[in-house]
């Protein structure tokens, strides 16, 4: 394509037949445009003595003739006359014979290819003067030689080639001396390559002396004509060398290989043009003015001049007189150039892609912003944020404490001055997000209606009268006062008795929002009091989160498992809770994150715990404790029938299906499978039963059989829930001497336990006592007290019985997995020792509890209700309680006490009578 275009262009030029003026003006313009770049120009103008010879193609079909034809008639006079006619670049090739010696111009980089125009900087003042002188006399011709690179130079001048060049010119000046006489020494022309280019000086432009040492310099515009070999130095300062003008070796223009190589060079130049537009101009110019595409040696020179190869490679091309070799070398350089060009284009494209991608995104974002603004959809982020916060905060402004208002205003101010991408902006934004979304005195509506509350509470829970009463009282006080204050109610009881679920019902009864969190195992104070804002990812504590999520300042907050509060290295969460739960302090609760006081005094706190022992004293002091003991069988039946069964059926998708559990089966389920204090296990068992029923129903449905109503009786239970688990609380049907049933109160509720005593060995002075069964310190002390007391007591009851003095005893409390501690086993241990010593079993179905002093007094203990329930569960008929617990027992409801005989004692003597002396 390109070749064709070029040919067309050439034809056009020929037909226009404007060889001289028109072309020269255009070429000058192009030259100006290309500036300092190497410009291809026809190497040799055909002089023929004509004054209009500028830019006339010089070559014939055979390149060999170039020199001869270029040479004829070329003279300084004709050249100078032509310069006056055209005013453009003069191309006139002086005959070799007229230039056996030439001024040597050193080229710091890139050799000058014949046919090419190249600017060269010269700093040698004498050389410049001489050149100017020559030009004034007519045409100036020089020999341009590439400086040898450092490695190949005989000069010791180090550094860059330009430095070498400077050094050379200086040395040349120095070595010539003042009188101009030649001095012995190295040939100054050694620093140049031997093969150079015979060149015409077109222009000499003096440059202002800007170098620090004030050296003169000038730029020469050289047009290469033909190859030269330097033979020797004729004169120094300026350097004049003897030269031999070289001709290209003869070649056969019709040789296939030459043709093919030539074509390939043209094709490669074409390729090169695709990637490098600068070359395009060069070539266009070349093609417009000359027709060298059929002239292989010229083409090779042109191709080489287009390459960015290093000086050595270009010099090699210059030195090759064999046309074929030169074409090959050029082709190699061109191919490399094309590769580099591709790589360059690739890199350029990548960079461009990236830049344009980024720019595109930027423009699109800007556009989006302005579109949004235009449509009023969104103000810019910051303004929108500030507006949001202000809008949220304004309605509350009046109820917010003054100092908090100040903080919020300051923060809003700060936010407006911050850069949205800064981290500070985010911190402030989050802080404002919290500050503005807290309720700040906004209370939720409250239902202070006793009847309604009673209804709601009863609807969800059976029994639990203490808790329900407490809530009703709370409402009553609120009604009378016209306002409610926060309270802290703590429910203590075994698992599964409904502590958590009634918390929820309380909120429902009062019409308040509900929030629950568990502090079991919590060891980090920050969970309650928040992190300081300086921490990355800082958050307020649970209470502030609660206020935000409920949006009111008077929710019911259930703090679960308060007895299992952890204690970590990050401070003591119990103390933090203290601040929260102390009615004196929680009006101005200070969260670390929020840093402004928050009023929590309207919050109704409900805490749950299994035991009270582990709740820190000061915390316990601020709570109202409501005890929930476990349920007896009748209560469980009630709960199961009214609440759990319905829920379990519903969960299994059996609400509409007729499936029932008979009363007997229910009693067995409760009595044999779910004997613990709470009803969670019962709930699980009922769910299990109904899941199995659901499977049956689903199977029947899939086979399209109609199913009769399912009735689950005692015998079916094994199918539904398996065999009843082994019950450890009744090991003995009848207790042997030395074994007594005690009553204990643990985190799981009340339970019966056996205290076993047996003799290990006997002998004079062997009386001792050993205890096992996970007993704590208090219980071990109780054993020691019991042992001492029993010795004395036995003497009074059975004088002469020296069993205790002579026998080493072992007391054990089975159920070794459960840690047991507390003083309430005192009377039980004593009784077991006595029973063994007297070899007399205690009254059947008897259980006892009570602390014993060394003098035999029986002191009251805790957990009477739990113990009573546990005793009943284990089939105990008679219980011995300390006299001090009579009031507790009397408070128990009738159904718990039903069928039980309670004996109240204040001294051990009475215990003895009930337990060991009962049959008298
Ligand atoms: P806790 O918090 O005491 O361990 P939960 O409150 O989780 O126990 O109660 C366990 C389950 O037993 C809940 O589904 C609850 O509804 C049920 N439950 C407990 N006590 C009663 C009750 N008195 N009446 C009705 N359901 C109860």
From Swiss-Prot:
Q: Which residues form the Lon proteolytic domain?
A: 734-918
> What spans are recorded as compositionally biased (Low complexity)?
75-88
One cellular component term (GO) for this entry is: mitochondrial matrix
Main localization of the protein described in the UniProt heading: mitochondrion
Presence of the UniProt keyword Ligase in the record: no
**GO biological process: one example:** cellular response to oxidative stress
Per the UniProt record, one Pfam family is Lon_C
Q: Where is this region: Disordered?
A: 65-94
Gene Ontology MF: a single term:
serine-type endopeptidase activity
Q: Which reactions appear under catalytic activity for this entry?
A: Hydrolysis of proteins in presence of ATP
Q: Which superkingdom, per the lineage?
A: Eukaryota
Enzyme nomenclature, EC number: 3.4.21.53
Tell me which residues form the transit peptide. 1-58
Task: Give the subcellular location.
Answer: Mitochondrion matrix
Q: Identify which residues the record assigns to the active site.
A: 824, 867
Family annotation (InterPro entries): AAA+_ATPase, ATPase_AAA_core, Lon_bac/euk-typ, Lon_lid, Lon_proteolytic, Lon_Prtase, Lon_prtase_N, Lon_prtase_N_sf
Keywords assigned: ATP-binding, DNA-binding, Hydrolase, Mitochondrion, Nucleotide-binding, Protease, Serine protease, Transit peptide
Q: By its UniProt entry, which SUPFAM superfamilies does this protein fall under?
A: P-loop containing nucleoside triphosphate hydrolases, PUA domain-like, Ribosomal protein S5 domain 2-like
Q: What positions does the domain Lon N-terminal occupy? A: 102-338
Assembly: Homohexamer or homoheptamer. Organized in a ring with a central cavity.
Which family is this protein grouped under? Belongs to the peptidase S16 family.
Quote the function comment for this protein: ATP-dependent serine protease that mediates the selective degradation of misfolded, unassembled or oxidatively damaged polypeptides as well as certain short-lived regulatory proteins in the mitochondrial matrix. May also have a chaperone function in the assembly of inner membrane protein complexes. Participates in the regulation of mitochondrial gene expression and in the maintenance of the integrity of the mitochondrial genome. Binds to mitochondrial DNA in a site-specific manner.
Q: What is this protein called?
A: Lon protease homolog, mitochondrial
